[in-house]
Amino acid sequence: MSLSSGLIAAVALAYMAVMFAIAFYGDRRSTPLPPRVRAWVYSLSLAVYCTSWTFFGAVGQAAEQLWSFLPIYLGPVLLLVFAPWVLQKMVMISKQENITSIADFIAALYGKSQSLAIVVALICLVGVLPYIALQLKGIVLGVNLLIGAGADATGTRAQDTALIVSLVLALFTIVFGTRNLDSTEHHRGMVLAIAFESLVKLFAFLAVGAFVTFGLYDGFDDLFNQAMLAPRLEQYWKETVNWPSMVVQTGVAMMAIICLPRQFHVTVVENIEPQDLRLAKWVFPAYLILAALFVVCAVIGVVTVIGWVVPSS
C-alpha cells in the first residue's frame, strides 16, 4: 500500500500551515500564558530532543541489538530526575549574563572570552551540519516509504523533498526564531509550536505502538509471548549487555540534553521562569519513557511478523 505524492504534499503543507499559525498566535498573543499552561508548554518543548532519529534510528538500532537504544533515553531521564539543580543553575546563570547560546554560556564561564565563544560556535556548526543532514535523510526515508519507493531510493524526487523541507524550515527559523537575540525577549511562538509538535510526535509514537500491540497482536502478553518463541528474535534474548559501552553512552546522553545547541536554547534560553523546571523534570522523563516503550513494541512486533526494520543510520 502506498500514498500519492500529492496527498503527502497536501498533508505536509496543511501541517506546516498549522505550525505557522500556532507560532504566529504565540508571538501575537497580547497577554502571557497562565503560569500552569506556560509550565506545560515549556515541559513539552523539551521534547525537541526527539527528532526523526527517534522514529528511524532508535528503531533500527534496537533491531540490531535490542537494548542498545536505551542510553539515548536513559541519560536525560537520570539527569532531570536526580540532578535537576544542574539545569536550574544553568538557567540562573543564563539570565544573569544575558546568554543567548551555548557558545555565550561557555565563554561566560571563562571571563566572557570572545575567542572561546568563536571556537565553541564553530565546533557546534561542524557538529550540527551532519546532524541536520541525517534528519533530512530521515524525512526523505519516511516519504519514500509512504509512496512505496525503496527506503534507500535516491534521485530527483529525494533531492527535491530534502530541498523543500530545508527551505520551509529555514523560513520558519527566520520568521519565528532569529528576529532578535535579546535573552529577555523569548520566542513564545516558536516554543508554543514546538510544544504542539511534541504532542503530535507523542501521539504518533503511541498510535504506532498501539497498532502493533493491539492490531497485530492481542495485547502486551500476546506480543511478548510470540516474541519469545519467534526464531528471528532468538538472538535478542541471548545477547549480553555491553555495560561499559552502556554507561559511557548514557553519560554522553546526559551531556547532550544540556549541550546540544537546540536543546540548550529551548531548555535554558527560552526558560521564562525557573520554577517551570519543577514540572519539566517529571513531564519530560515521562515523555521519553513512553517513546522508549514505542521503540520496544515496534521492534519486537514488526520483526516478529515480517522480519523487516529500518536502517539505524
Q: Model regions: which residues?
A:
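Membrane-interface "cap" regions at the ends of multi-pass membrane proteins
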Residues: 1-57, 164-190, 196, 202
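Alpha-helical transmembrane segments of integral membrane proteins
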Residues: 6-15, 39-40, 71-75, 116-120, ...
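Helix-loop-helix junctions that connect adjacent transmembrane segments
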Residues: 147-161, 213-253
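Hydrophobic alpha-helical transmembrane segments in multi-pass membrane proteins
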Residues: 116-120, 129, 165, 201-210, ...
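Membrane-interface helix-loop-helix modules in multi-pass membrane proteins
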Residues: 35-100, 107, 201, 212, ...
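Helix-coil boundary and interhelical linker segments in multi-pass alpha-helical membrane proteins
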Residues: 1-6, 60-70, 149-152
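Hydrophobic alpha-helical transmembrane segments
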Residues: 14-31, 65-72, 109, 195, ...
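Helix-loop-helix module between adjacent transmembrane segments
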Residues: 19, 71-179, 183, 248-256, ...
